[in-house]
Swiss-Prot record:
GO cellular component assignments: cytoplasm; plasma membrane
Origin superkingdom: Bacteria
Organism (species): Aquifex aeolicus (strain VF5)
Ranges for region Domain IV, binds dsDNA: 291-399
Lineage: Bacteria, Pseudomonadati, Aquificota, Aquificia, Aquificales
Pfam families xref list: Bac_DnaA, Bac_DnaA_C
Name of this chain's protein: Chromosomal replication initiator protein DnaA
HAMAP family for the chain: DnaA_bact (MF_00377)
Length: 399
């Protein structure tokens, strides 16, 4: 029997059949006609007609199934509700990033895509990404926020469990993807391949992608050219904290911690902080121990860093002022990078604190020095033993 003849038989039983059958997907498989119903009601309607009104030989030609609904992908968004666009403090250095994100939220995926925000540590990138996520979620969009490091770790876990398709489907089902700390994709080749395919899928579906990094895409060493090219394919926005914005943030944080400080303390905070994390850390310490407690702690930390520099200078027989200068001879350069490394490992100093102690404008040099020491330790056993020896000596003598 041909399909047209079969349909006429069904239509002869029910006057509404012509309209109802338009809702079905009809396939011919293994000598049978498969009618795929869009829902339970349609399936029951056709089964009733087939089983009640059609002859046995015709019934054998028909199979009725209900359309299988795709399982809804469960999304863990990792958003912190404390970050909002309303409490993001806007100034000259971050206004463009803020405005671009706000505009993108009005036209997800079609106006600026991707958005790549870059700037130093603690300039508000995470706050802005989280705030964008919370705003989009409030409007009913599906959102995921993740750091590149967390993305990599989750991917590895899913590979081990054999559930990598679940991981891919979760990321590919969102309306807004927020990836923070993009610099941590560096050197992770398998992670980059996975992210590249997720990025492409979302981009082709016109879903919004917002990325944040501590450096411009061109400076992302160890990240593939094709990913860098994708990052540069949208809009690049630098984010900075100028003095006026930092002053606003200090005032806001003081309100948050219910503190009133005299002008000279606020001036001290302005002069001795570069980012939001430092501001928050120092205000917390003032709340706990008072301004004098903060001064004592910072003096002690600075002294420890200088003791590390002096210790390394003595070992390498170079001058402290040479380590703190821009001298580039081999001996001084090695002493400098090891001193920076020990300041981080032995004293747990922040990158910015180390940069300040070594009279550097930002922490990029410090990151490079620490990475250089770690890479050389992997390649050179003698160097590894030397660094281990100096680390133990510094810890015993200074900390």
């Amino acid at each position: 029997m041909e399909l047209n003849a079969l349909i006429k038989k069904i239509e002869s039983v029910d006057s509404y059949a012509r309209e109802f059958l338009k809702k079905f997907e009809i396939k011919q498989e293994k000598g049978k006609f498969l009618f795929i119903a869009p829902g339970e009601d349609y399936r029951e309607w056709l089964e009733t007609i087939v089983n009640t009104f059609l002859e046995e030989e015709v019934r054998k030609l028909i199979e009725v199934k209900e359309k299988e609904e795709k399982k809804k992908v469960e999304i863990k968004d990792f958003l912190n509700p404390k970050y909002t666009l309303e409490n993001f403090i806007v100034g000259e250095g971050n206004r463009l990033a803020y405005e671009v994100v706000k505009e993108a939220l009005e036209n997800l995926g079609s106006l600026y895509n991707p958005i790549f925000i870059y700037g130093s540590v603690g300039t508000g990138k995470t706050h802005l990404l989280q705030a964008a996520g919370n705003e989009a979620k409030k409007r009913g969009y599906r959102v995921i926020y993740s750091s590149a490091d967390d993305f990599a770790q989750a991917m590895v876990e899913h590979l081990k469990k054999g559930t990598i398709n679940e991981f891919r489907n979760m990321y590919k089902s969102v309306d807004l993807l927020l990836l923070d700390d993009v610099q941590f994709l560096s050197g992770k080749e398998r992670t980059q391949i996975e992210f590249f395919h997720i990025f492409n899928t979302l981009y082709l579906l016109e879903k919004q992608i917002i990325l944040a990094s501590d450096r411009h895409p061109q400076k992302l060493d160890g990240v593939s050219d094709r990913l860098v090219s994708r990052f540069e394919g949208g809009i690049l926005v630098e984010i900075e904290l100028d003095n006026k914005t930092r002053f606003k943030i200090i005032k806001e944080k003081l309100k948050e911690f219910n503190l009133e400080l005299r002008k000279e303390v606020i001036d001290y905070l302005l002069e001795n902080t570069k980012n939001v994390r430092e501001i928050e850390g120092k205000i917390k310490l003032i709340k706990l121990k008072g301004f004098e407690g903060l001064e004592r702690k910072e003096r002690k930390e600075r002294d420890k860093l200088m003791q590390i520099v002096e210790f390394v200078a003595n070992y390498y027989a170079v001058k402290v002022e040479d380590i703190l200068s821009d001298k580039r001879n081999k001996r001084t350069s090695e002493a400098r990078k090891i001193a920076m490394y020990l300041c981080r490992k032995v004293c747990s100093a922040s990158l910015i604190e180390i940069a300040r102690a070594f009279k550097r404008k930002d922490h990029t040099t410090v990151i490079h020095a620490i990475r250089s020491v770690e890479e050389e330790k992997k390649k050179d056993r003698k160097f590894k033993h030397l660094v281990g020896f100096l680390e133990k000596q510094a810890f015993d003598k200074i900390c």
